[in-house]
């Protein structure tokens, strides 16, 4: 039997980032919030499903707010103060995520809508039935 050697645990050095970009992907079923640095390297991310909401409760503005708070708290550990917000998708969490990030104390520099719009590409699916 081989003897066990103690594995060295290296503490990861957290980089200090002053400004970041909050990418909000708000679909009809879920909301994904990713906070990156200026180069696009992810610092933190959170989803409505990961915040404990399942099923139809994931697609609520409150679930998106909780996801934004979780991602924002992790990003504050990196020293992020200013955020540029990029929103993608038509979901119900579009506005509440921006409000939650603002309430956490981030200075929101710009808000832009980057929802991809086809130039008459693929045929869309049938109308959503309730």
Swiss-Prot record:
Keywords from the named record: Ribonucleoprotein, Ribosomal protein, RNA-binding, rRNA-binding
UniProt-recorded Gene Ontology molecular function terms: rRNA binding; structural constituent of ribosome
CC terms in the record's Gene Ontology section: ribonucleoprotein complex; ribosome
Chain ranges passing through the membrane: none
Domain of life from the UniProt record: Bacteria
GO biological process: translation
HAMAP family: Ribosomal_uS11
Family statement: Belongs to the universal ribosomal protein uS11 family.
Role played: Located on the platform of the 30S subunit, it bridges several disparate RNA helices of the 16S rRNA. Forms part of the Shine-Dalgarno cleft in the 70S ribosome.
Subunit field text: Part of the 30S ribosomal subunit. Interacts with proteins S7 and S18. Binds to IF-3.
Name under which the protein is recorded: Small ribosomal subunit protein uS11
Organism from which the protein derives: Thiobacillus denitrificans (strain ATCC 25259 / T1)
């Amino acid at each position: 039997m081989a003897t066990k050697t103690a594995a060295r645990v290296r503490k990861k050095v957290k980089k200090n980032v002053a400004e970041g970009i909050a990418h909000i992907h708000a679909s009809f079923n879920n909301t994904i919030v990713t906070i990156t640095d200026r180069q696009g390297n992810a610092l933190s991310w959170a989803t409505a499903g990961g915040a404990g909401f399942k099923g139809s409760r994931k697609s609520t503005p409150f679930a998106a707010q909780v996801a934004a708070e979780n991602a924002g708290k992790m990003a504050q550990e990196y020293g992020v103060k200013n955020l540029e917000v990029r929103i993608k998708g038509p979901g119900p969490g579009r506005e509440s995520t921006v409000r939650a990030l603002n309430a956490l104390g981030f200075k929101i520099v710009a808000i832009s809508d980057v929802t991809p719009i086809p130039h008459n590409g693929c045929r869309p699916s049938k109308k959503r039935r309730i």
